[in-house]
Amino acid sequence: MTEIYEQAKHSLQGEDFSSFNYLFAVNKLLSNPVSYDLGRDLIVRALDSRERFSEHTTILKNMVRKSGLFPYLKKEFTSLTPDDLRVLELYRTPFSDGYVFHSMQFHIFDLLKSGQNVVLSAPTSMGKSAIVDSLLGMGTLKRLVLVVPTVALADETRRRLQERFGDRYQIIHHSSQVCHSDQAVYVLTQERVNERDDIVDIDLFVIDEFYKLAFRQLKSGDIDHQDERVIELNIALSKLLKVSRQFYLTGPFVNSIRGLEKLGYPHTFVSTDFNTVALDVKTFGIKANDDKAKLKALGEIAHACVDATIIYCKSPTVAGLVARELIRLGHGTP
């Protein structure tokens, strides 16, 4: 199946491109659960080259539906059948008539709506925040806690929720705020969760980037049991489990989770690679602790980049190191 995917992907840029053969390959990949993600990736690439599919727009639209990328039905196609419109109505979110779920978002939303505890491992582009907003949009939950890793993200989340739900919920985002409403959403870092004594009778709590509950391994091979942020997050989790009826943990690249069942907290674990963007991944094979090789690769990558480029770093310290190296190499200067 990988060979079919690679051939179709490379053919998209070829002069003798056949849109029918490309969509035939997409259909074959989408029809097999093992290769479903590859088929969806090809659909995203096809939508980025719409002009090459002008002769088979209807087939492309049907493949978009088959891939579960329902938001693109509304965004990319003007000629929609009554059946297409019914699909859009079914997957429309409770908080906005203009926002449509894709199939994985709807699946997670449906699990949470039914009262199940959910642990979700998914890429950033899956749109996990829209699921929380949809639960709020239903209006059935009164008290929620959203635990986010940074103050900056708490402020960003607070602004979004204030704009959408400020008329219905009190949005609490810092330690000194007094809760004066029966309907409240706490948007806090783990430290601020632990500082408050009014977090009780919670309908649902959400922890973003829950993988940070685990202590990290040092370069020496030892486990860093002194990381205060990890300790604070575990204390916050313990506190919230005792006062909440339901939980939703989200994060990327987690294959399994242990311990919650033994503690008496049944949950549904969902691990998905559902991406709404197409990615071309190049692997350099650099060891995790080989900083010299990483900086060398950084120079090679920066030299090859001609458009605006985003570099993701795991910490402010690493971001500073990368910035200094780029400046030394002459990038980002007039």
Regions from the language model: what does each represent?
Residues M1-P334:
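N-terminal helicase ATP-binding lobe
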